[in-house]
Amino acid sequence: MLHTFTTFFSPFSAKMMYFCSLIINAMSVKKLRFAIFGNIYQAKKSVSIQKILSFLYERKAEVCIDSEFYTFLTDGLHIDVKVDRVFEGDDFEADYVISMGGDGTFLKAASRVGTKCIPIMGVNMGRLGFLADVGPSEIEHALLAVYAGQYKIEEHVAIMVETQGVSQLAGCPFALNDIAVLKRDNASMITIRTSINGEHLVNYQADGLIVSTPTGSTAYSLSNGGPIIAPQAGVLCLSPVAPHSLNVRPIVVPDDAVVRLCVESRNHNFLVAVDGRSEKCAEGTTLTIRKAPYPVKIIKRNTHKYFHTLREKMMWGADTR
């Protein structure tokens, strides 16, 4: 009879026991604090945000929400959002951050977290979702895992930019993906005098130059022919945008390298894009790009495997015929 009993439950017993352990562990932990960011252009997220808020409310979590996202939910989607606090900018404290949107929303959340080093969980409401990899149907299970402590935290390198000379950047100088120097206002190329650790590398004549982290290697850099770099590799990649010479190729340098850029432009200005946040700079401004003094902490499920995600997102091996 014992053998029959074991056989009857074996197909699903392991999965059920694991799920039950998440629930039991989640019920015994302290009150947690969550900060929520979201994309304000995706109405389809209304069901997901209600699911998250209900889950956290049942567990008496302390919840604060970004003011722009709060206004979108209450005024735009007419959702009754009950939270402990609405905040602006980086004026918040939390144990965990939840980013609802795509990778762009995740990058925005990471810039707001900054030196707080709060772990971020990305809920993917966008398209590709390398960073925001929790699907809407997986939200409850992912939150249960957080409460049960059954998750891992990946520390991703961030980079920062400093300016010397004519222009100063007004926005956040830190990037998780990339910092790009780009031409502005006309079709003429710009010249980017580039040095690594004080040693001259090359004068790029191109539409721009992307300095990317391993995390950003699957973003803008990839579309310009840059290599895919595993997240924990300690390197940065310099990828020229539409270079004049075909001999100029992307180059990988150690992530403790100091990259210095000085730009010449026919219309005497250019753009600096920090994770897509663009600002105008005047010719004569020197940019210094280096590794940030803190990592970005990303919550991943224990079952997460980078190369599996990469293969799925890139559709490697998929027959699209």
Regions found by a protein language model. Give the residues of each.
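ATP/nucleoside-binding phosphotransfer catalytic cores, i.e., glycine-rich phosphate-binding loops
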Residues: V181, N197-H200, L246-R321
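Catalytic core of DAGKc-family lipid kinases
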Residues: R127-D207
